[in-house]
Amino acid sequence: MVREEVAGSTQTLQWKCVESRVDSKRLYYGRFILSPLRKGQADTVGIALRRALLGEIEGTCIARAKFGSVPHEYSTIAGIEESVQEILLNLKEIVLRSNLYGVRDASICVKGPRYITAQDIILPPSVEIVDTSQPIANLTEPIDFCIELQIKRDRGYQTELRKNYQDGSYPIDAVSMPVRNVNYSIFSCGNGNEKHEILFLEIWTNGSLTPKEALYEASRNLIDLFLPFLHAEEEGTSFEENKNRFTPPLFTFQKRLTNLNLKKNKKGIPLNCIFIDQLELPSRTYNCLKRANIHTLLDLLSKTEEDLMRIDSFHMEDGKQIWDTLEKYLPIDLLKNKLSF
């Protein structure tokens, strides 16, 4: 962080992108300013945004690879230049773009001799490769080579303990961090009591999203963190009132669906195959469910009202939105018999 004195004017608080460029397929750069801020505010915003950008943005990555009959990750495979460990490291570097939730399967199946690159990965429709030229392995002999892959969307850095995987399946330390780096600097302007600050924010991403998209998502995540306090103020309840308040259940999926075998929706599609991103929920409700690892309609129906009300930022109006959505996917007559508001 750098502080400098510059001349400037005090206008209504606003932000804008002052520089944007694409250095390569896997390196995007953006520079933004927010001004004017009172003394100390630039630090508050800069620190919060930097942490949110580096740790709260979701990314898609390869989380597991399965080789046939490979005793350990340091093994070598006849006809392949790289060891299994080197192949795993190359797979870890593959940059993917998607809106998927949960785990999806992918694969590589080629015949040598040839170079294997990211474009050889057979992906589900919802996933795309940012840079198809990323190397994976070099087949030096005419052999058939197949790998089964698992792809997931997550945030941060996920590690898994290595075990003796007899089936040739190996976890990859997944790096779901589309933002590579964030810097911010603060510039002071004005004199005396008219002194203000300008926040400069620099963002580098891996190409799976633009710096502007990353900044928007980080800002939304920060806003969601403070929504409970805003709602408490709007409702006008004191701490003691809120502590002792009982929330009547507006909906009870698990209890009221007891003894009801709802494994499929009205169209006969299994509920575990209907993902919440297909339900057209409001973004706030959708984000609440996503953060609680509720990815499918079956996940949603397995929750009680107590489970849902414990989700951060989840409110009564979210329950009403979910009810409206359920009417589209479940038998209405059965729902009316089991669920009431």
From Swiss-Prot:
Its main location: plastid. One of its GO terms (cellular component) is mitochondrion. One of its GO terms (biological process) is DNA-templated transcription. The keyword Transcription applies. Residues 269-341 are annotated as: Alpha C-terminal domain (alpha-CTD). Keywords: Chloroplast, DNA-directed RNA polymerase, Nucleotidyltransferase, Plastid, Transcription, Transferase. It is an enzyme of class 2 (transferase). In plastids the minimal PEP RNA polymerase catalytic core is composed of four subunits: alpha, beta, beta', and beta''. When a (nuclear-encoded) sigma factor is associated with the core the holoenzyme is formed, which can initiate transcription. The N-terminal domain is essential for RNAP assembly and basal transcription, whereas the C-terminal domain is involved in interaction with transcriptional regulators and with upstream promoter elements. This is DNA-directed RNA polymerase subunit alpha. It comes from Lolium perenne (Perennial ryegrass).
